């Protein structure tokens, strides 16, 4: 009797191996069938291609690229939101300029009818090659975006802005009519339709969004973004951009210091922050970003208000040092090369550029109108 029990124990592993082989055979058959029906790449084991990685595009500010884990991801939905005049459009135009530098094609859906071609040109955008649309309705705007994405000929599309995507029913209706949830429904339907194609074609779609205040909120963050909840879910990256301080020379204002919080990031660690200068009429100060990182990485030494590079004293005050480096392009390039070499060698992102989000960062609700 004891021998029979022992025999059954020995037979059990063999039966388990047979079941496992049968399961693997069935799995192989179904994977082959799915690939035959839907094409190669429709389904795969994650370990089959260890080289799968998200390709990124520079944002125009190297400090923000570090906070994003390399830059703005291609083939993803990105939302940039913030108060008025915080730098949303400037950041989007810099992204367009960076893509055009590599030979990419860009489109700008100007729902606000407020794009300034002269300013875009100053930021480095090739306005002659920029594809622009000024749609009459929200449905028209999203249909144009869908067709551009499906063409697989566009590298980046900027929609400025979600708040200006007015549904057709609202435009054709009377001024006092209530249209509850129309815009949220429009965004939900459109994003369901275009998201799959965005991933297949590698097109980056950037939505610019505005902030609203929720009435009657006693606790928590009263701010909300427009367009419902769909964009929050479909976006791989959400950037909250705010003015941190005004840059002045004497009494004259010449720019803004802005702070960007990576509220959501599906392709790199979230909750990082980046700061950079936006100069009026010139855009993002790339030299300012390099100087800030050089100080953090101890390539440039700062003692009090004085800056030194090696044995050379650069000057007193950040503005004076930036002016000096603008005149001395060779020295500025030398510092930039050292900064980029440190980043490429895997140097940690400076602690000043990484921080936990402020309370309420990810509590932005969404209005349904």
From Swiss-Prot:
GO cellular component: cytoplasm
Species of the source: Gloeobacter violaceus (strain ATCC 29082 / PCC 7421)
Compositionally biased intervals (Basic and acidic residues): 1-10
Gene symbol of the encoding locus: recA
Region (Disordered): 1-20, 350-369
Principal place of residence: cytoplasm
Biological function: Can catalyze the hydrolysis of ATP in the presence of single-stranded DNA, the ATP-dependent uptake of single-stranded DNA by duplex DNA, and the ATP-dependent hybridization of homologous single-stranded DNAs. It interacts with LexA causing its activation and leading to its autocatalytic cleavage.
This protein's record includes keyword ATP-binding: yes
Protein's recorded name: Protein RecA
NCBIfam families linked to this entry: tigrfam_recA
Listed Pfam families: RecA (PF00154), RecA_C (PF21096)
């Amino acid at each position: 009797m004891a021998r029979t029990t022992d025999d059954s124990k020995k037979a059990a592993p063999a039966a388990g191996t047979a079941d496992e082989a049968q399961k693997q055979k069935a799995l192989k058959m179904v994977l082959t069938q799915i690939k035959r029906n839907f094409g190669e790449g429709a389904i795969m084991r994650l370990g089959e291609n260890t080289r799968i990685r998200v390709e990124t595009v520079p944002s125009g500010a190297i400090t923000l690229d570090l906070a994003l884990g390399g830059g703005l991801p291609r083939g993803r939905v990105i939302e940039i939101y913030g108060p008025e005049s915080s730098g949303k459009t400037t950041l989007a135009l810099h992204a367009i300029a960076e893509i055009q530098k590599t030979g990419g094609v860009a489109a700008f859906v100007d729902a606000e009818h407020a794009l300034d071609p002269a300013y875009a040109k100053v930021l480095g955008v090739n306005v002659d090659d920029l594809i622009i649309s000024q749609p009459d309705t929200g449905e028209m705007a999203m249909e144009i975006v869908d067709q551009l994405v499906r063409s697989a000929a566009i590298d980046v599309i900027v929609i400025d802005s979600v708040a200006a995507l007015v549904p057709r029913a609202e435009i054709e209706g009377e001024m006092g009519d209530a249209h509850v949830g129309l815009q949220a429904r429009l965004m939900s339907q459109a994003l369901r339709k275009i998201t799959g194609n965005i991933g297949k074609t590698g097109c980056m779609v950037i939505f610019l969004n505005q902030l609203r205040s929720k009435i009657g909120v006693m606790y928590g963050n009263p701010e909300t973004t427009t367009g419902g909840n769909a964009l929050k879910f479909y976006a791989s990256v959400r950037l909250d951009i705010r003015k941190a301080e005004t840059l002045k020379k004497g009494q004259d204002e010449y720019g803004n210091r802005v702070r960007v919080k990576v509220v959501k990031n599906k392709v790199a660690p979230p909750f990082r922050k980046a700061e950079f200068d936006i100069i009026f009429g010139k855009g993002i100060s790339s030299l300012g970003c390099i100087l800030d990182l050089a100080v953090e990485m101890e390539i440039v030494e700062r003692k009090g208000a004085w800056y030194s590079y090696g044995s050379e004293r650069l000057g007193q005050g950040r503005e004076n040092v930036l002016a000096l480096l603008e005149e001395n392009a060779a020295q500025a390039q030398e510092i930039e090369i050292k900064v980029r070499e440190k980043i490429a060698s895997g140097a940690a992102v400076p602690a000043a550029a990484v921080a936990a989000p402020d309370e309420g960062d990810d509590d932005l609700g969404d209005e349904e109108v």
